[in-house]
């Protein structure tokens, strides 16, 4: 937990910290490339894909590049369009659910989690709204868990300011579709904020789907 994060923070060198910050600043592009990569990877046999990923991890960094489990889930579909008017909640799809879609082996007529949440809201008479510019925002866990302070501070500040703006200064409740993301927003993000941004964060009503 906290001890491991501190150890990782102490072990993060300047080069890795710089790469992590650059990744945080370009997260929308990273999302797009990752999603395209998952879609492409589903067309490649698992063994060659795993070998290539491991080689890349050895060259770049095992901390920044994940292993390739198998079988891979599908790449996420485009987020559903939702109107702001009449919405009862702001829906923030976690970046993991903006990259990965249906699990391997899912029924052909099944839908991605974001579409399921939107449809559930519609049927229950509690429609949700997904901002058009949600790409590029993240709870910061990929950086905080590895001890990359600058990248974490950048994303924590960005998401709090965006959520505050999207929710009309806290008027709309915010629902999140990944427990780890909700936890990060509620427990970890405040540690990386300035006093002014902590005030914005305190006005947000964040809850797990």
Where are these regions (language model features)?
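Iron-sulfur cluster-binding electron-transfer modules in prokaryotic oxidoreductases
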Residues: 2-209
């Amino acid at each position: 937990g906290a001890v491991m994060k501190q150890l990782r923070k102490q072990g993060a060198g300047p080069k890795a910290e710089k790469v992590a910050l650059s990744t945080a600043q370009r997260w929308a592009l990273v999302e797009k490339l990752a999603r395209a990569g998952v879609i492409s990877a589903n067309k490649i046999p698992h063994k060659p894909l795993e070998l290539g990923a491991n080689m890349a991890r050895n060259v770049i960094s095992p901390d920044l590049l994940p292993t390739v489990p198998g079988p891979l889930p599908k790449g996420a579909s485009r987020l559903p369009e939702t109107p702001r008017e009449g919405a009862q909640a702001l829906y923030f799809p976690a970046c993991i659910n903006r990259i990965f879609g249906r699990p391997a082996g899912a029924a052909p007529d099944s839908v991605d989690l974001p579409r399921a949440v939107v449809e559930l809201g519609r049927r229950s008479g509690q429609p949700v709204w997904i901002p058009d510019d949600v790409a590029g925002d993240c709870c910061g866990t990929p950086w905080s868990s590895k001890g990359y302070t600058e990248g974490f501070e950048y994303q924590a500040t960005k998401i709090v300011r965006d959520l505050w703006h999207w929710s009309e200064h806290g008027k709309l409740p915010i629902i999140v579709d990944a427990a780890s993301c909700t936890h990060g927003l509620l427990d970890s993000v405040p540690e990386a904020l300035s006093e002014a941004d902590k005030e914005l964060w305190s006005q947000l009503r964040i809850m797990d789907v």
